[in-house]
Amino acid sequence: MSILKEFREFAVKGNVMDMAVGVIIGGAFGKIVSSLVSDVIMPPIGWLIGGVDFKDLAIQIAPAKEGAEAVMLKYGAFIQNIFDFLIIAIAVFSMVKAINSLKRPPEVAEAPAVAKGPTQEELLAEIRDLLKK
């Protein structure tokens, strides 16, 4: 079997195509969530804290030198990325939970209780009576 034919079979399988669509949609979803966090969620939080723009929060590690900018530790961007992650994680968890609830087999009603048979003593007494005959 040629490599090209094997690759074609691999690429055309349903799982690979589903995964490709998922990656594309995931990339677009990530951009939407990033915009939601940086443009909608963080500005009001910054305003409530006292007019802080989280994008600008940073600690200067080394001052600027000739021809080089100052070295900055931008923890504000890190905080925004944490919010991005939390929103994406909650969304993915919710979708997986919804899909799993749809995949569960419907619960089967319990079978009606079977009538109890004779007890061991009753069976032994019946055998004894049969042997006496």
Swiss-Prot record:
It is found in: Cell inner membrane. Keywords: Cell inner membrane, Cell membrane, Ion channel, Ion transport, Membrane, Transmembrane, Transmembrane helix, Transport. The chain crosses the membrane at residues 10-30, 76-96. It is a multi-pass membrane protein. GO terms for molecular function: mechanosensitive monoatomic ion channel activity. The keyword Mitochondrion does not apply. One of its GO terms (cellular component) is plasma membrane. Gene3D superfamilies: Large-conductance mechanosensitive channel, MscL, domain 1 (1.10.1200.120). Homopentamer. Channel that opens in response to stretch forces in the membrane lipid bilayer. May participate in the regulation of osmotic pressure changes within the cell. Belongs to the MscL family. PANTHER family: LARGE-CONDUCTANCE MECHANOSENSITIVE CHANNEL (PTHR30266:SF2), MECHANOSENSITIVE CHANNEL MSCL (PTHR30266). This is Large-conductance mechanosensitive channel. It comes from Haemophilus ducreyi (strain 35000HP / ATCC 700724).
